[in-house]
Amino acid sequence: VATLIRFCHNHGLTQITDRPQWYTVRGGSRQYVRRMLAALQHDGRHEARLNTPVLGLRRVEHGVLLQMAHGTEQFDAVVLACHSDQALRLLGSDATPQERSVLGAIRYQPNQAVLHTDASVLPRRQAAWAAWNYERAADAGGNQAGVCLHYLLNRLQPLPWQQPVMVSLNPVRPIDDSQVHARIEYSHPVFDLAAIEAQSQVVTLQGQHRTWFCGAWCG
């Protein structure tokens, strides 16, 4: 319950009046990457390698060995900016018991996001349209069969179109295929009691064996 209340509070969902003002970055989140790359290139002391997947890693006395498709290279330290289960796979047999305990405690669930223009998923009354629209499905017996969030992007982004553009997370009813522009599969952490306890232990891992962790799963 505390996790849900914290999430709602952080997103301004616990207040009726004085709603938060949404802001967006012009050009989208890719601007973060462009600014970081520009800073690294301007610095002259760092090198950014794109499209270079890391297959595994191993900590040694004076650094960290990263295994890539073209071979293995040694670095001073490593920051694992990924899901905890992905970090655990990269560490492999090199993971410590504490890392296995903390990283392995967090479960993930698959989620599908659908980008579309099928406005039938929104409330019948246009006056009720919001940035976030909640929909609950029930089975024949009236029991809850699924929950979906429809994000109305026109309320969140300065889109140049009048037509409603939505992102539906885990749709509970069919969306008109002719109005679907993209389907994206995600994996999100499940913040249950085990995950919350693991989050409190992440700090004990940071910097150990020249390894750092970050990501939404850290809390």
Where are each of the predicted segments found?
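Mid-domain catalytic core of redox enzymes
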Residues: T52-P189
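Active-site/ligand-binding neighborhood in enzyme catalytic cores
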Residues: V1-R58
